Amino acid sequence: MPSHARHATFRLLHGLSLMVAMPALLAAAASAAPSPAAQLAAPPQAARPGAPPVKAGSQTFNTVITKLKEGKQIFSNTIIGPDLEVAKKACQGVDFVWIEMQHSTLTWRESQQLIKTVAEAGCIPFVRVPTANESDIQKATDAGALGIIIPMVDSVEEARNAVMFSKYPIGHRDNPNARPWGHRSSGQMQAPSLWGPGYAVNANNNVLVMILIENPKGVGIIDDLLEEVQGIDIVMVASNDFGMHGGDRDGDASYNAREKLVRESVLKHGVVLAGPSSWKDRPGYRLFQGPRDATTTGYEPTPAPPK
C-alpha cells in the first residue's frame, strides 16, 4: 500500500476510535467537574488576605441580613468624604456604613475604594446612589455594595426599576434558591474579590434594596408600592426631607400622621422599617442611619500632612 494511503487509513481509524471513546471521555469529565451546587458547597478560597470567605454551603454573606433574621436592631455610621482612615473608624461599633453619594462630591473611584475599605474592616457597605438609574446602581453593586439606597422614591415604576437594576436575572439557572427578578448585567468587577467566588449566584439573596420615603407623594403610594413591587427589603422614613417636603416638623400632627401611615404599611407588608438613629426607641424601627463623619461619633478625619 502506498505510504500516503497508509497515512490516510491510520487517520481514519484514529478518528473512528476517538468517536467510539468520546462518550466515555465526556462522562468521565462530567463526573470529575463539580456541579454549580457542588462548587457552592466546597469551601472557597479566601478572596483577599484577612477576608472571611463565603462559608461552605452558605448563601448569606451579608451579615446585616443575618442580624435582621435574629431580630436585632441594625446601626450605621455615614461617611461623605474619601478619607479611608475615616472609613475604617466608621466601622467601629456598627453593622454597616452608609456611603453618601447623593449629598456629597464623592466620585465612583473614591466610592469603590471606600466600599473595599469598609468590607475589609469587617463591616457591610451600603451606598446611597446619586440617582436611581441603571448606571449608578450597576456601579455600586459591581463595586461590592451590599445595600443599595434609593433616594426620594415616589413612584411604583421607580421602585420596580431599582429592584431590577440591583438584581441579576439568574433565576434558577445556577442557584435554585436565588430570588429571580433582575436586569443587572454581569460585570461584577470588585464585588467577587470582596465577597468570594460564590458572589454571582448568591448576590440576589445578599444585595438589599432600601427605598427612602421623603415627600407626601411617596407617602401616598406606599401601600400600592409595597403591594406591587417584589424585592423592596427596607423602607426608610427620611426624617429631615419628610418634614421639609411636608411643610412641617417631627412632632407636628400632620408629620406624625404621615409617619404613622408609612410605618403601619411597612410593618403590614413585613418589610424592615428604617429611620435616623435618634428614632431607635420608636416602636417598629429596626435599622438606623447614623451621623455623618465626625459630627457626633467621635472618629476624626486623618489630619493633612504638614507642608
Listing of model-derived features with the role each one plays in the protein:
Residues 147-229, 239:
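Conserved anion-binding
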Residues 65-77, 119-128, 201-214, 261-275:
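Short beta-strand/loop segments at the ligand-binding rim of alpha/beta enzyme cores
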Residues 87, 132-146, 150, 157-158, ...:
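Catalytic cores of alpha/beta
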